[in-house]
Structures are given as C-alpha cells and as structure tokens.
Amino acid sequence: MNYVPELKKYYKDSVIKELVKEFEYKSIMQVPKLEKIVVSIGVGEAVRNKKLLDSAVLELAQITGQKAVKTKAKKAIAGFKIRQGQEIGAKVTLRGNSMYEFLYKLIHLALPRVKDFRGINGDAFDGNGNYSFGISEQIIFSEIDYDKIERISGLNVTIVTTASNDKESKALLLKFGMPFSN
C-alpha cells in the first residue's frame, strides 16, 4: 500500500463532503483542491555576497525536502544594483504528497512557533482563489539549525488552488486548519 499524507486523507474523507454541502456543488469534481504551493526567498544581498544565495537554496531544500531553483532578475534595477538575469533568489514548487506534507508542517508545527502569533491575514487572496503570505523568519521551521544559518531571512508562500473565487478558497484552507486572524 502506498503512503498517503494525513492531510490528503483528511481532504478526501471529510473536506470534500463538507464543501459539497456548504457550496451545494452538483459534482465532487467542482470541489476546489490544492494545485501547488510555491515557497520562495528573495536574497537582495546576493548581488554582493553569492554565499547568501547558496545558503538560501540549502535552507529552502531543508524546509521543503525538495531541491530549490535559483531565480533570476527579470529586469535591471539601478537603485538596487541589479542587472537583468542576475540570480537574486530561490524557489521551490511543491505538488502531490510533498505539498500536503509541507502544508501540514506549516499549519501545525511552524506557524505556532511564531512569537506572539495571532493568526495570518485572511484577506491576502488574489481574486482567483490563490493565497499568498510572508513568513518573517525561516527559523520557525525545525529543520533549520539556528547556529548554522548565515542570516535570518523571510519566506514567501503562495498556495494555488483550483477554486474559482476567494470565498471557496478560504473555506478550503479553513477546513485544512489554516489559522486566519479574520
């Protein structure tokens, strides 16, 4: 028997039924589901110190369990001394089982470790059912050893769903246990 993450099992067993009842879908295929989660780090100082970018790639790989890809500047910005095509960040796109594992770890282990945590903003949806938020410190993840990091940096997390609007997407994430403050 293949391994199925706890959150994926919960989605199939409970969340689908609850959302069908709540939004009165005609078919279970209309129920929104998670498509992917993109975790990224922007490292502006990578212009001067390449070691910081390598450190960010390593940290993302430790946090997500998947190899990170370096991202490049789309256009030159003279004020930041950035040239087009210069590597200035890293990202990981999670799908399938690793996506559900990361979401479980984020909701139940990492976010509760944030100092004075009162929930995340529930209004950061993009109008198409996708949700993005920032994490100010990567050290909330247990995989990161505080003594071995170059510097404390933040992460961007984007959760892409198949929901057609923000209301359905928020309901889906609430069923997964996302701690919204509003």
Curated annotation (Swiss-Prot):
GO terms for cellular component: ribonucleoprotein complex; ribosome. InterPro entries: Ribosomal_uL5, Ribosomal_uL5_bac-type, Ribosomal_uL5_C, Ribosomal_uL5_CS, Ribosomal_uL5_dom_sf, Ribosomal_uL5_N. The keyword Protein biosynthesis does not apply. Keywords: Ribonucleoprotein, Ribosomal protein, RNA-binding, rRNA-binding, tRNA-binding. It comes from the Bacteria. The keyword Zinc does not apply. GO terms for molecular function: rRNA binding; structural constituent of ribosome; tRNA binding. One of its GO terms (biological process) is translation. This is one of the proteins that bind and probably mediate the attachment of the 5S RNA into the large ribosomal subunit, where it forms part of the central protuberance. In the 70S ribosome it contacts protein S13 of the 30S subunit (bridge B1b), connecting the 2 subunits; this bridge is implicated in subunit movement. Contacts the P site tRNA; the 5S rRNA and some of its associated proteins might help stabilize positioning of ribosome-bound tRNAs. Part of the 50S ribosomal subunit; part of the 5S rRNA/L5/L18/L25 subcomplex. Contacts the 5S rRNA and the P site tRNA. Forms a bridge to the 30S subunit in the 70S ribosome. Belongs to the universal ribosomal protein uL5 family. This is Large ribosomal subunit protein uL5. It comes from Borreliella afzelii (strain PKo). The lineage of its organism: Bacteria, Pseudomonadati, Spirochaetota, Spirochaetia, Spirochaetales.
